[in-house]
């Protein structure tokens, strides 16, 4: 007889535990859904703010570029223009990241080629002069 009571109490405890686990899972899934919806809303608002900020920065950069494009520039103004161009490239890279990385790679390669030309140009000139002098002495 004690066995029946122990079994009944164990069954009640197990079913109560199963219901509490099920309720916990449901509340967690509802919480996850709410969090996901909140994140979507935040991302949407963030996207709108980001695009508005990009548009404002592009407009400001264009106005400043037009201002500095007309007339002579001081070295400081030239530096400002370089920074504005860099900002414009960065803003464009947010819109098209693949193209921006390709442009950056091309720009880096062109810079490297220019450095090599600056270094190799005088060296090749000296080598050419030395070979020319040797040929004159031999000939």
Swiss-Prot record:
GO cellular component: extracellular region
Gene Ontology BP annotations: defense response to bacterium; defense response to fungus; killing of cells of another organism
Tissue specificity annotation: Expressed by the skin glands.
InterPro entries: Bombinin
Top-rank taxon: Eukaryota
Residues annotated with Isoleucine amide modification: 138
UniProt main location, coarse: secreted
Function: Maximin-4 shows antibacterial activity against both Gram-positive and Gram-negative bacteria. It also shows antimicrobial activity against the fungus C.albicans, but not against A.flavus nor P.uticale. It has little hemolytic activity. It does not possess a significant cytotoxicity against tumor cell lines. It does not possess a significant anti-HIV activity. Maximin-H3 shows antibacterial activity against both Gram-positive and Gram-negative bacteria. It also shows antimicrobial activity against the fungus C.albicans. Shows strong hemolytic activity.
Family: Belongs to the bombinin family.
Protein name: Maximins 4/H3 type 5
Species, as recorded: Bombina maxima
